[in-house]
Amino acid sequence: FDNAATDYFAVENSIFENSASANWFDPDDGHYDFNPQFADTTYVLSEYSRAIGRGGSSIEDADENDLLAPGVDLLGNPRPNPAESSPDLGAYEHVRSEYRRAVYYVDDANGDDEAPGLTIATAVKSIANAFIISSNRDTIELAAGTYSGADNRNLNMGGLTRIIRTSSGPASTIIDCENQGPAFVFDTDEPDSVHISGLTIINGSSENGGAISIDGADPVFENMIFRDNNSDGNGGAVYASDSYSSFTNCVFVDNHADQGGAFYLSGGDVSLNHCTLLDNTADDDSGIKNASGDLAVMNSIYWGNDEISGDV
């Protein structure tokens, strides 16, 4: 666009390719720069398109008049559809009120970060790239393998709800942080609908939470193994501050920290259910450190660790 300074240029609830760096680009005003994912050459949206339900009912023109969205699309179908939902972007209205949540596949051995990731055959290579192309409430499924390197650690959930899983199990699906950071960071109020399951995390290292660092978020972990992670500060495997997270069917083994060899809690309400904690050590002699908050340990085995410090 080449508008003079006096021209009126209003953009709301629209996709503009390569516009994210423009001085007018503002996601809070409905400015988007993502692939609309057309179903075919007719430019109808696919059911996975994030353009579904992203429209608005009106826009204000230069004279502060409301311009109303049309009641039908190019084919004469009612807009929005269904009624009382938000309209879609573009010329065609989809039958869905919101886009179908997608599954993105990751394969460290055979994946390609230029691939779309929506099938096993078109899997991406890194978890970081799966984060980039996926959206809120999508699922990321990891193939068996060992995931290492900068694109497979320090993964910040960014406030989005995601399910991260594998069908192969933790014995064969491993994130190796190579002592260069934690695997996952939660610091943007992620809810308890964030689920991570079926992975082993090894060689994580950070000041707070060698493998997992949680601050004010409530993720859920199931069927996980945390092994050989360390922290110079708190929580060799997991650091949780003001968190209502839960851990079920998890193993913590050979993790080390200054405080809380396996786990450090500071505020919140965290549960460990059907977990096994073995040979976790800390410089202050606590395998689990509860500095404050409520920690519930149920149906679990705590063996060969330094003693628990704080209330449980």
Residue ranges and their predicted role:
Residues 1-48, 60-63, 75, 83, ...:
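Predominantly extracellular beta-rich ligand-binding scaffolds that present long acidic/polar faces
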